[in-house]
Amino acid sequence: MDARDIVLSVISVFSAAALVYRWLSLYDRVDMTVIFFATLLIASLTLLLISIELRMQRIMDEFKSVKRTIAVNSDDLEGRIERLFIEKVRDLEDKLESIERRMYR
């Protein structure tokens, strides 16, 4: 969460309070309860958005961690498969040489 997010949150809360006050003053029916609850509503929405952003950042960090783990595991798996493949190819070459020797005798 950046300082920019906090500043924008504070601005949205104050602007909501000012907007509701101005709107109600047009009809000469300024009610502080309505202004308070409108401000509370905007504050809760702002906090909800900030909480969603923080949750998304945590999920992205987890994805990056999983991606690193998969990369390390795939490198290890590639090495093991390559060693196994080389071993099997050597066995196959030895068997082919053995068959060729028998054929030429």
From Swiss-Prot:
Keywords: Cell membrane, Membrane, Transmembrane, Transmembrane helix
Annotated Gene Ontology cellular component terms: plasma membrane
Topology versus the membrane: Multi-pass membrane protein
Protein known as: Uncharacterized protein AF_1457
Transmembrane annotation, as ranges: 7-26, 30-52
Subcellular localization: Cell membrane
Main location: membrane
Originating species: Archaeoglobus fulgidus (strain ATCC 49558 / DSM 4304 / JCM 9628 / NBRC 100126 / VC-16)
